[in-house]
C-alpha cells in the first residue's frame, strides 16, 4: 500500500513540475504548488523513517529464539545470585526465615520473554493468542484433536507480565488422550466446584469459541448487553431464544477489538462454531437448546465470570492466611494501566515505603473494591461533583461515594493503599483524573484497545490529509 501511495505521490509531483514549467498558470499558484510538493515529500520521508525504525524495534522475534538466545545470560545471572556449597558450609550464606524470603526477581531472559508475550497480547490476532497461551490438546477416540485452555491459561492470556510455563508456547501443548472418566476426575484441577468454569462442557476447559465469547463478556459494559437484549426481545417478555441470543452475541462481538481482529482459520482449526457446538450455549439454553435466556440471568453470569477471574488473579499471588500483600494488590490495580515503566516503579516504591510491614488484604476487601470499579463512570461523575463543589477528594469522600454509587463498604486499609498509589503530592487527596483513567483501563483489562500498532491507519490518515491540504493550497477559494 505504501509503495502505491509513494508512486502516486511522485506522479503528482511530476505533473506539478510540468504544470510549473509550462507557464500556463499564474505565478502565485505555481509557487504554492511547489511549496506543497516540497513540504509533502519532506513530511512523508521523515514520518516513514521514524515509523520504520519503530516497527523494526517492536517487531517480535519468535519465543523459541528468545529462549535459546537468552538462556545462557539468564543462567549465568541466576548462578551469580546463589551461594555456592562451600559458602553455605562455612556459614557465610545464611538461609532467611520463611517470612523474610523475598520473591525471586525476574532475570534478564524472563523479562525479554514477558515483553514478547505482552506484544502478543497487545497486537496479535485472537487465533494466535489462543494458540500461544493454551496448554492442552485433547485427542478424541477417532483421532481428531482440539486445543483447549484451562481457566488459569485464560487468565494468563489477558494478564500482562504473566509468563507462559516453560516448554509451552505457540502450538506447543500437553497432549491428553480422550478418556471421559479420567478427564472428569481431573475437573477439580482445572476449576473449583461452584466456579463458572466448572460448569463448562469439557470438564472446565475452554475451547476457542468459548474463549472469544468470554473475552467479549469481560470487555463489554453491562449497559451494552441490556440495550442489545431489548433490541432483539421482539415480544417484550424480557427473554431471548438461542437464535436471538446468537444475533446479540454477534453484534456485541463485532464492537470489540477481539471480534474485529478475528478471522476464521481452518488451517489451525480455530473457527467460531455455531451455538449447537458451544458448551456455553448449552449452559444457557439447556441440553435441548429450547430454553429461554433473560437479561437478569445473563448479567448474573457476567457477574460470576468477573468474580471467578478475579479469584484466579488473587490466588496467583499465593495468599498467606487468605491475604495478599499491599504491593501485590497495587500490582493488580496497575496491571493494565499502560503507565511508563519509570513512573510505575516510582509508584510501587511509594507503596513499599508506606507498607513495609502491612497486614495484607483479604479477597473480600479486594472484591469490594472491584465492585466499586464496575461503577467507575458513575464514580467519575460523583467525584467531579465533589471537585466542582470545592470539597477535597479524601478517603472519607471515597468511602461515601462507594456506599452511594456501588452499595459496598471500602475498608480503611484499602483506601490507604489506593491513596498511597495515587496521592502524588502526599497531601492526603486523590489525583482524580489519573485515578479514574487507570481504573477504567483496569476494569476493561486492556481488552478494549485496538489489536494493531496503528501504522496502516496512520498512513491512510496522513495521505488523506496531504491530499486535502494540497488542493486547498493549489486552488484557494476565490
UniProtKB/Swiss-Prot annotation:
The biological process GO terms on file are: calcium import into the mitochondrion; calcium ion import; mitochondrial calcium ion homeostasis; mitochondrial calcium ion transmembrane transport; positive regulation of cristae formation; positive regulation of mitochondrial calcium ion concentration; regulation of cellular hyperosmotic salinity response
Region K/R-ring: start and end of each range? 128-131, 261-265
Q: Which family does it belong to?
A: Belongs to the MICU1 family. MICU1 subfamily.
Q: Which residues carry this modification: Phosphoserine?
A: 124
Chain positions recorded as Ca(2+) 1 binding sites: 233, 235, 237, 239, 244
- Per UniProt, Ca(2+) 2 binds at 423, 425, 427, 429, 434
PTM (free text): Phosphorylation at Ser-124 by AKT1 impairs its maturation and stability.
Source domain of life: Eukaryota
Q: Region (C-helix region): which ranges? A: 457-467
Basic and acidic residues composition-biased segments: 69-85
What positions does the transit peptide occupy in this chain? 1-33
What's a Gene Ontology MF term here?
calcium ion binding
Quaternary structure (record): Heterodimer; disulfide-linked; heterodimerizes with MICU2 or MICU3. Homodimer; disulfide-linked. Component of the uniplex complex, composed of MCU, EMRE/SMDT1, MICU1 and MICU2 (or MICU3) in a 4:4:1:1 stoichiometry. The composition of calcium sensors within the uniplex complex can differ depending on tissues: a MICU1 homodimer can be present instead of the MICU1-MICU2 heterodimer in skeletal-muscle and kidney. MICU1 is recruited to the uniplex complex by EMRE/SMDT1, and it associates with MCU at low calcium levels, occluding the pore of the MCU channel. Associates with the MICOS complex.
What CDD domains does the annotation carry?
A: EFh_MICU1
Q: Enumerate the subcellular locations listed in this protein's record, separating them with semicolons.
A: Mitochondrion intermembrane space; Mitochondrion inner membrane
The segments labelled Polybasic region in the record are 101-112
Cross-referenced InterPro entries: EF-hand-dom_pair (IPR011992), EF_Hand_1_Ca_BS (IPR018247), EF_hand_dom (IPR002048), MICU1/2/3 (IPR039800)
- Chain ranges of the EF-hand domain: 220-255, 410-445
Q: What is known of its domains?
A: The EF-hand domains have high affinity for calcium and act as sensors of calcium levels. The polybasic region mediates interaction with EMRE/SMDT1 and association with the uniplex complex.
Asymmetric dimethylarginine: modified positions:
457
> Where do the coiled-coil regions begin and end?
none
What gene name is given for the protein in this entry? MICU1
Pfam families in alphabetical order: EF-hand_5 (PF13202), EF-hand_8 (PF13833)
Protein name per the record: Calcium uptake protein 1, mitochondrial
Amino acid at each position: 500500500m505504501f509503495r502505491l501511495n509513494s508512486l502516486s505521490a511522485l506522479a503528482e509531483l511530476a505533473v506539478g513540475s510540468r504544470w510549473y514549467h509550462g507557464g500556463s498558470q499564474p505565478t502565485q499558484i505555481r509557487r504554492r504548488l511547489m511549496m506543497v510538493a516540497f513540504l509533502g515529500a519532506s513530511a512523508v520521508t521523515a514520518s516513514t523513517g521514524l515509523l520504520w525504525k519503530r516497527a523494526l524495534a517492536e517487531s517480535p522475534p519468535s519465543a523459541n529464539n528468545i529462549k535459546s538466545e537468552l538462556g545462557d545470560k539468564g543462567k549465568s545471572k541466576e548462578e551469580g545470585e546463589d551461594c555456592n556449597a562451600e559458602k553455605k558450609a562455612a556459614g557465610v550464606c545464611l538461609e532467611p526465615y520463611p517470612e523474610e524470603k523475598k520473591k525471586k526477581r525476574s532475570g534478564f531472559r524472563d523479562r525479554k520473554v514477558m515483553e514478547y508475550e505482552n506484544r502478543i497480547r497487545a497486537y496479535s490476532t485472537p487465533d494466535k493468542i489462543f494458540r500461544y497461551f493454551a496448554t492442552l490438546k485433547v485427542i478424541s477416540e477417532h483421532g481428531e484433536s482440539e486445543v483447549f485452555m484451562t481457566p488459569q491459561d485464560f487468565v494468563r492470556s489477558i494478564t500482562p507480565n504473566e509468563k507462559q510455563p516453560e516448554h509451552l508456547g505457540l502450538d506447543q501443548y500437553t497432549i491428553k488422550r480422550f478418556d471421559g472418566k479420567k478427564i472428569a476426575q481431573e475437573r477439580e484441577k482445572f476449576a473449583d466446584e461452584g466456579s463458572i468454569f466448572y460448569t463448562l462442557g469439557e470438564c472446565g476447559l475452554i475451547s476457542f469459541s468459548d474463549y472469544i465469547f468470554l473475552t467479549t463478556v469481560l470487555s463489554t459494559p453491562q449497559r451494552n448487553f441490556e440495550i442489545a437484549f431489548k433490541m432483539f426481545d421482539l415480544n417484550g417478555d424480557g427473554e431471548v431464544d438461542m437464535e436471538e441470543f446468537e444475533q446479540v452475541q454477534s453484534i456485541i462481538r463485532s464492537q470489540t477489538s477481539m471480534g474485529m481482529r478475528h478471522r476464521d482459520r481452518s488451517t489451525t482449526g480455530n473457527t467460531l462454531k455455531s451455538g449447537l457446538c458451544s458448551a456455553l450455549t448449552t449452559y444457557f439454553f439447556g441440553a435441548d437448546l429450547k430454553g429461554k435466556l433473560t437479561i437478569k440471568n445473563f448479567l448474573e453470569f457476567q457477574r460470576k465470570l468477573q468474580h471467578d477471574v478475579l479469584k484466579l488473579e488473587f490466588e496467583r499471588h499465593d495468599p498467606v492466611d487468605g491475604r495478599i500483600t499491599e504491593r501485590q494488590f497495587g500490582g493488580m490495580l496497575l496491571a493494565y494501566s499502560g503507565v511508563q515503566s519509570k513512573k510505575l516503579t516510582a509508584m510501587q516504591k511509594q507503596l513499599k515505603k508506606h507498607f513495609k510491614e502491612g497486614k495484607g488484604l483479604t479477597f473480600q476487601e479486594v472484591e469490594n473494591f472491584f465492585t466499586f470499579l464496575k461503577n467507575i463512570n458513575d464514580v467519575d461523575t460523583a467525584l467531579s461533583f465533589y471537585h466542582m463543589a470545592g470539597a477535597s477528594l479524601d478517603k472519607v469522600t471515597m468511602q461515601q461515594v462507594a456506599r452511594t454509587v456501588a452499595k459496598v463498604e471500602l475498608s480503611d486499609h484499602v483506601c490507604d493503599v489506593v491513596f498511597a498509589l495515587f496521592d502524588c503530592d502526599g497531601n492526603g487527596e486523590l489525583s482524580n483524573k489519573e485515578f479514574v483513567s487507570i481504573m477504567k483501563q483496569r476494569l476493561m483489562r486492556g481488552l478494549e484497545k485496538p489489536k494493531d500498532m496503528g501504522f496502516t491507519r496512520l498512513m491512510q490518515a496522513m495521505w488523506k490529509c496531504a491530499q486535502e491540504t494540497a488542493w486547498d493550497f493549489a486552488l484557494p477559494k476565490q
